[in-house]
Amino acid sequence: MRRVVVTGMGLLTPLGCGVELVWRRLLKGVSSATKITKFDPSDYSTSYACEIPFGDDTDEKFNPDEWMSLKDRRKVDDFILYGVCAADQAVKDAGWTPDREEDLLRTGVMIGSGIGGLQSIGDLSLIHI
């Protein structure tokens, strides 16, 4: 068995984008619960959730344009975009800039996520009913 070393971290959470920002907000006790904006919650018992806040660089919200083109974003569910963002942050945090193909092939990123792609799962289930 080989040893693994964690050399960099990246975070995209409802509290924000980036390890330092999320950590600062955690220490301050900031809540990320807001009114649901991604869908109409009127059929549910609550209208609040902790969504990833989209925005631009000026408001400390997640700017998807920094991580993926709009053309590519149309092809994937948001959770893929979130993983790309966090993985890119982790590689940059590690200061990892490999020059050789061999080093690129030996690079790995571990991603943790609850569940993703629910919109696509729901859409596909309607097609096959």
Predicted regions located by residue number:
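Conserved "HGTGT" condensation-loop signature of ketosynthase/thiolase-family condensing enzymes
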Residues: 1-127
